[in-house]
Regions:
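Residue-level recognition of short, structured coil/turn motifs
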Residues: 1-2, 105, 170
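Charge-enriched, short contiguous segments at helix-coil
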Residues: 15, 20-36, 143-193
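Alpha-helix N-cap/helix-initiation sites
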Residues: 4, 85-86, 172-175
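Amphipathic alpha-helical interface elements
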Residues: 34, 43-142, 146, 153, ...
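Internal, Lys/Arg-enriched amphipathic helical interaction segments that engage polyanionic partners
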Residues: 1-61, 185, 192
Length: 193
């Protein structure tokens, strides 16, 4: 005679991975991570590929604060915290752009910023670059040929998406949208600068 399988008894043996609640069994965060490690995920294959590509990029990032931002964005993405992944990946991209301009184009940037707005005080640090609105910053770095106008258009779309995700509202974001967002940043910011 065949013994019946008792799911509750099986799950109880994995008390760190699943817990019994009044509504039934729930997978804990460590349990979800364990399933992801086993390859069990709701993420599409394309989304898993993007996360893998991003992890490969971490080693290439020289700036520690940028690396921490990108790593946190990847963790948000893998944990299906999509709005957070959008915000964190955008912050990482802006950090890369600020560092690149500061190290390689600061004089040209300040000249262009003053040409457009005579009240602009010269930036001397990456933090000073943060005084400028991000959309205006993108306009200035196009004008001094750090990025092209088509890249700016894509980055502006990413900025708009970040702004939508960074504030409470009804916007819904899925894995594929986040994969697209991160891929644009990966190809046009992280890999190039």
């Amino acid at each position: 005679m065949r013994a019946e399988w008792n799911p509750s008894a099986s799950l109880a043996r994995y008390n760190a991975l699943a817990i019994r609640t009044p509504q039934g069994w729930e997978i804990t965060e460590p349990g979800k991570q364990h399933l992801r490690n086993l390859g069990v995920t709701k993420l599409s294959p394309a989304a898993v590929h993007v996360a893998t590509d991003l992890r490969a990029e971490l080693a290439k990032l020289k700036n520690d604060s940028t690396r921490l931002f990108v790593e946190e964005a990847i963790k948000c993405y893998e944990a299906e915290l999509y709005r957070s992944a959008i915000v964190m990946s955008w912050l990482a991209a802006v950090d890369v752009l600020h560092n690149h301009v500061h190290q390689n184009h600061l004089a040209a940037f300040n000249a262009e910023a003053k040409r457009v707005d005579g009240r602009w005080r010269d930036a001397n640090t990456t933090d000073d670059l943060g005084r400028m609105a991000e959309a205006d910053f993108l306009d200035r770095i196009v004008a001094i040929s750090v990025i092209g106008k088509n890249v700016k258009k894509e980055l502006k779309d990413c900025l708009d998406r970040r702004n939508g995700c960074g504030h409470p509202n009804s916007l819904k974001i899925g894995a594929n949208t986040v994969a697209h967002h991160i891929e644009i940043l990966l190809l046009n910011v992280f890999e190039l600068l």
